[in-house]
Amino acid sequence: SVGFKAGVKDYKLTYYTPDYETKDTDILAAFRVTPQPGVPPEEAGAAVAAESSTGTWTTVWTDGLTSLDRYKGRCYHIEPVAGEESQFIAYVAYPLDLFEEGSVTNMFTSIVGNVFGFKALRALRLEDLRIPNAYVKTFQGPPHGIQVERDKLNKYGRPLLGCTIKPKLGLSAKNYGRAVYECLRGGLDFTKDDENVNSQPFMRWRDRFLFCAEALYKAQAETGEIKGHYLNATAGTCEEMIKRAVFARELGVPIVMHDYLTGGFTANTSLAHYCRDNGLLLHIHRAMHAVIDRQKNHGMHFRVLAKALRLSGGDHIHSGTVVGKLEGEREITLGFVDLLRDDFVEKDRSRGIYFTQDWVSLPGVLPVASGGIHVWHMPALTEIFGDDSVLQFGGGTLGHPWGNAPGAVANRVALEACVQARNEGRDLASEGNQIIREASKWSPELAAACEVWKE
């Protein structure tokens, strides 16, 4: 008799297990599956589970040397998608032992590394992940988190204000520093390097760091508030990235920045560890996210990338605006904003949250609203995002007819007016425009901004 039965086999025999009870230590994934015509849902769901865990396309004799039952991914539930005949959600459970501790890189390589090019599927999208407590605890997470950041900055009870310095490419370091100073002097908490500002011929990183640090200290001395500028440490190698972070620390600045998707999760986690060890805050930009998350039926939802960032580490992350120039549906956005900030988030399908997620006291991340927003959006932003957020007005500060500092003043006045109105019990949704108008009566800077950007 032969030791094992050779040949190609159906995945669903081994990998579709509807009776399976998920364990607390399993990593759970929700995939939106669009199979090729004629492939039944069970087979497609099982194929996803197999290809992203222990499966290969044929029987191999080395299967006999291990326990498949202990190590295989299992498709344990399939549900139809309302309004889509050819789509369904496949739920897959992965045993914890398949993953290296503290490695977002390995988690993604395992779960989404190979299976997305699979022939039996027309399209595949990872909608959500449930990270078990045991796995969360192997990550350091954000270098500092929301509470520690507020304590370092001594700013409480309101969202923080930021601004990306434009034009993003072409300024010299000295002029760039001047723009930073004007914004901070006017009343912003932070200014930001654009995500594509690294170290180009017209402005090398070291010069920029120096002039921005000078701008920061000057603005701090003038205003009596702590100021920050997100110095982009993203670089072509990890060594160079850490070198830039070290220089930022030597200058004594409070915060650096990283593009976590283009830079990669390994680099990002290294930088996050450095930042915690050296008291630097870490601002994360999500350049390249739309390549991965924009298609509705293929790729990965941003909430998965956001969860991954909280594990890998970052104190701020860009997460859409709900109101500006970039797309983002309100409930769905609020769903992953809460996943970033809160310690425990209940499953809620109306907000796109497929699993209850317990972060077991991992620090939270501040969501950053950025992109096409201006003073008229302030009431809505204050209401939607609440206190724990960073509101970033690039053109909405620098586009002010009187210059950067008055633009910053306008934003700060608008924010303080909205926070005060909210604290007095007024309804920002219905009275927002009126609140801004009232505030603009005693702030010429805000009045000028209201003129430029009509409601």
From Swiss-Prot:
Molecular function terms, GO-annotated: magnesium ion binding; monooxygenase activity; ribulose-bisphosphate carboxylase activity
UniProt-listed SUPFAM superfamilies: RuBisCo, C-terminal domain, RuBisCO, large subunit, small (N-terminal) domain
PTM comment, free text: The disulfide bond which can form in the large chain dimeric partners within the hexadecamer appears to be associated with oxidative stress and protein turnover.
Modified residues (N6-carboxylysine): 192
Subcellular location: Plastid, Chloroplast
Entry-annotated residues carrying N6,N6,N6-trimethyllysine: 5
Site feature location: Transition state stabilizer: 325
Known role: RuBisCO catalyzes two reactions: the carboxylation of D-ribulose 1,5-bisphosphate, the primary event in carbon dioxide fixation, as well as the oxidative fragmentation of the pentose substrate in the photorespiration process. Both reactions occur simultaneously and in competition at the same active site.
Note: The basic functional RuBisCO is composed of a large chain homodimer in a 'head-to-tail' conformation. In form I RuBisCO this homodimer is arranged in a barrel-like tetramer with the small subunits forming a tetrameric 'cap' on each end of the 'barrel'.
Protein name stated in the entry: Ribulose bisphosphate carboxylase large chain
Species per Swiss-Prot/TrEMBL record: Lupinus atlanticus
